[in-house]
Amino acid sequence: MARTPRIKSSGEGTAYYHLISRCSNRQFLFRKAASKDRLMDLAKRAAEFSGIKLLALTVMDNHFHILCSVTQSSEAVSREEIIRRVGVLKGDAAAQELRERWDNFAAAGFTAMLEAELCRYRARMNDISAFMKTMKELF
């Protein structure tokens, strides 16, 4: 049975969410403390990248709960802020690689390509679905 789609707030302001995710096939992936610690670290990094504030995080043996707040804003996330967030999520080398890529786009006059990539990153900001996807992909 498919899960019920998330009901997400639309518009500016702060919204609060209780997110739950279970392991597939009734596996107990988080039984070991190291796995729980790894998931908690990934959640913190993914939240920083996504612009989401973690309020509480509980990791059980086969599922986890996240309580978070998301503040929507009409202001777009700047290019430098996106690069900083990529560094938090994937490390300084990935952030530097992205900076060089975008600098090369700008130097070559490929502004449409640069803007398209910026739009893809901005679409992932302040979005709980993108946050959960990012976190699970990194685990």
Residue positions per predicted region:
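Short catalytic/metal-binding and nucleic-acid-binding patches
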Residues: 1-139
